[in-house]
UniProtKB/Swiss-Prot annotation:
Pfam families, sorted: Cuticle_1
Keywords, sorted A to Z: Cuticle, Repeat
Expression (tissue specificity): Calcified shell.
Sequence repeat residue intervals: 3-20, 27-44
Gene Ontology molecular function terms on file: structural constituent of cuticle
Protein name in UniProt: Cuticle protein CP459
Key word Transmembrane helix present: no
Source organism: Cancer pagurus
Amino acid sequence: AVLLKGPSGVLFEDGQKRLLPPGVEIVLLTESGAVLSNGENVQF
């Protein structure tokens, strides 16, 4: 899950930090990961 979300990045509960390019959003968030609008997958 997302612990903190700002305009330029996301901090996930497991400690992962992900910088988000301008205009990229989280489009799907599940217990095991997230899919970003640029097609990237983040697993946690």
